[in-house]
Amino acid sequence: GGGELVALIVGEGKGGGSSPLRAYVSRTLPDYAPILVCNRAPREPKPEGGFARGSGGVITALLTMAEATGADWVACARNDAERELAAKDGAPVTVPLLQSTGRLHYATPTREQYEMYYGVIANPVLWFIQHYLWDLGNEPVIDQRIHEAWSEGYVEVNRQMAKRVVEVARAATKRPLVLVHDYQLYLVPHMVRQEIPAAVIQHFVHVPWPTPQYWKVLPKPMRDAILEGLLGCDIVGFQSSLDVRNFLLTCEENGGLQVDERERAVVAGGRVVYARHYPISIDVLRTQGLAASRGVKRQEADLAKWRPKHLIARIDRTDPAKNIVRGFIAYEKLLRYHPELRGVVQFWAFLQPSRQDVGVYSRYLRQIRQMAGRINSELGTEEWQPIRLEIAESERKAIAALKNFDVLLVNPVYDGLNLVVKEGALVNGTDGVIVLSENAGAHEELREHVLSVNPFDVEATAAAMYAGLTMGSEERHRMNEAARDVVRVNDIARWISNQVQDLRDLVAPGRAAVRPELHQPAPDTPDRRRN
């Protein structure tokens, strides 16, 4: 049990300049005990024994953050294996995390509570609101099941997570610095604040923050509780400046609160809450190391055996927000408008299955398969298939695709940030062109170095793919290099250090609850330098 987890965790997280970063964080915030709070643990027990690294860009980023801050990690036991691990020896599991002094602590809701919290409210209700995915003429239908899932699932699991955070915080010798992550845990900050008023609390929202009107899909008690939860923070972090503006508007319109747009701050309950944006990024050194690894080179050798003259690629989870079906429709139009491309181009869709226990997601994967199948049967020949559809998970294969694309299609309906586009910009070695949705958070940073598209406009998307395939080599090279430079500079270390600076500058110890200088120019925060 625990020993294996220790062995796995120690010795990871060396990338991304994490040791200098660790020194910087402890210099900047010396008097705090950091606690990272996330629905998922960084390591997950496998049914056959041993542990797997938590998958996904967010977990990778949070591992770097935990390593940089030496944070304890509070997670939710999400399945029987984790519940069993948490209950071993009659005590919650606390194991060394990374090379830091931190430990891992579980909250342990019942299977039913977890399902209501995660499988009903978080996904799809909140996810679909925050990505504008509901077909509002027909759904959602907010019935007794959803009301019960809210109170007995979402509120209850947030309460259990907050209780665990408070226990960990009270055991610490320094002032707690609570770093909460994502849409599953909106209520935690207020709950922790009630128990530990002196805590410094930040919540980082990884998904888009929609307009106040769209939040009105949720019944008022639910959306009020979400705002109240977040306003327990000192700082609420978002992926883009648009998310910050939407959040401030939501506080003003739906919450009736006093907002200072220039300072990007809300006054609530006699406290000032700041809203700031910190676009998440990737660990540049780790990603480059992976791209140069033998495993990736083996995948590239396999790719070379079947690679067409022109390779269009996409790497995504099979989530309706990723807009995969419209991407296929646009590609079909490309082939019909430009028949000379048939036989010399192939669209490689390398997709990771997502949330197949949620009906909307399993239906979406079916649609993806059907659309690819139809296009292949109508336009394909014995020698050539227009779409190569692979449903699997392999980080090495994904990186091999990103190193070799001519066009990378990243066309989400809405996306908090999108790390695939940053990985592609960093590792691509073929002067590939990125076609990027204007509704991805990453568009704010990369807009000048990509071909921007409206994700709903399949004609424009087809035209952008064609422009990418036919662009002159000098322009391709220039765009490719410029995008890479943006990612190199705005790496994961900068994401973390910008947050740390704001925690120091905006929430300095001993400052009055309401800053009298709120309406004076703010200190020189990282955000100011960026905007």
Positions of predicted regions on the chain:
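Catalytic cores of carbohydrate-active enzymes across secretory and cytosolic contexts
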Residues: 3, 7-531
